[in-house]
Amino acid sequence: MEYNFTGSSKPRRTINLSGEVQKPVSALAADARTQREDRRRQKLRNSAATRIQAAYRAYATSKAMRNTFAAEFDRLWQNSQRTPSDWVQLTRCLVMAHSRQPSKLHAHRMAAWANDVCGASLWTKPELHACNVLFFMVARRMIFALQYTPDLDVSDARAMILFLLWLQSDSYTTEEQRRAALYMLRFGLHSAIRQCILTFPKEATEECVALSLRPLVLFPEPTTEFAETLDESASASPRSIFIRSFVSDILTLPHLFYRVPISSVSLFASSFPLLDIMIHVQALGAYYDVVSGDSVLAHNPIHSPFLLGNILTIASRRINTMQSGTDVCHYLQMLATLQNALPTTTFDDHTTTVDPRTKKQIDNLISDQHIRSVLATSTRFAHSTRPALCTFLIATLCAWPVSVRDTLLISLLYAYDKEGSTRSMQIGSLVRELWRGWIRSSFLTRKMAVKEQNPGANVVAMRDALTNTAYAQDWTLFLTMCIVYGRCLVILGDDEFYPRESMDASMPTRNPLTMDELVVLSGLLRNLVFFMHWDNVGMTGDS
């Protein structure tokens, strides 16, 4: 060892005369990158800590300010002799004391303030109108409190509902009432009313119904415009915004008409904007793909079975009083849209997931009285309603179970007069009317009947007939006729289908189509079936 020769235990220093470094360049570069990354992360940590501390300080400061305004409100509220300026200051304190976390205490403050404001006689007219902006801000906070305050007292909620209704009363001009109604609609008025109806006892919901329908009086002009959004960026008309939120939040309530008193049900029936709602539901259906089941619109209300049940409760009683074929078409297309948007398990008693009360409402759609009314009303406007009727029938036949389909098909084999009583006519008159009045001369029939020398041309024509959306209406007519005529053939005897020459000529034949018409129809079906077999790539040879 070294110290045995030198007498020292200190290790000798290493002398590197060649100039070699102890670490390679790659290691030094890696160390530099590591140090740089550590400095960057430290800077990010410092920046994040600064933001967090700033946010906390802002939260603490705003909370202290809210507490200050709340204390000021409580102090001013103790004074029973309030001047108009005191009311203005109270309103400002009430607005500034509002928090994003709703509390029952602040909701109680707003309810007490609302009770006194609605009944205050010391407010002169100019000063009352000068506080409109503050009142709108209070209204927005009340709507928020009605939606999200847990265990809100019914008395406090009713006081806020009355204040929101007072803002749309005759205390203001018509223009001011409309501005208040539009402001509240954009900030979730119907969503707040929905929460109140769900939690209030039945006898306390009368004001809720009156408030939900008040915009109909302020915006009386019917509209066909569709509002996709309800926020401040919405550029649609006020009535379309009302219809959008009314359908989404009110008509989707479970057992709506069992949750409100009889007087409110009468108000619903008299004020119900059926035409606007029918057009709106069809617009909602345009955002839903029946084949794939995809919906472009978020939270599409047509997928709620309660919407179908609530609409049927009122609309089914108006079908006999409709005075135009356009209204009947809208009604039938609305029912088709709502049925297509629901799973088929909804309509089957054995697989349904809806409650018995809602199922009973939905069953009104296929009741004998409703079907008779639909057929009779469609007969009154046969020249314009048959395509919509077939759309409704196809949707109903596809949605409901087999037992309902059989009953419906039997009803379709017989015609109804304008009063809904059975006519003494030949069986299957609807088949004859559809074939001779609509299908025989349609573009779809001409497309399917093309006979070219080249078989490929026939295939191209049939493919176009099957895939072109321009023939959608013709297809519903054609399918309805084939389904009803197929059931007609089941119940006809041989002598009724092809009567003998010796039979009485005065007795009408029960076969709705002549032999020549049947030959043409058979040719169309043959071409259709052949193309479907030819074009199906996945079909095996055995099938």
Model-identified regions with their sequence ranges:
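Context-dependent free N-terminus signature
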Residues: 2-4
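Calmodulin-binding IQ motif alpha-helix
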Residues: 11-87
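Eukaryotic non-catalytic interaction scaffolds in large regulatory proteins
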Residues: 80-543
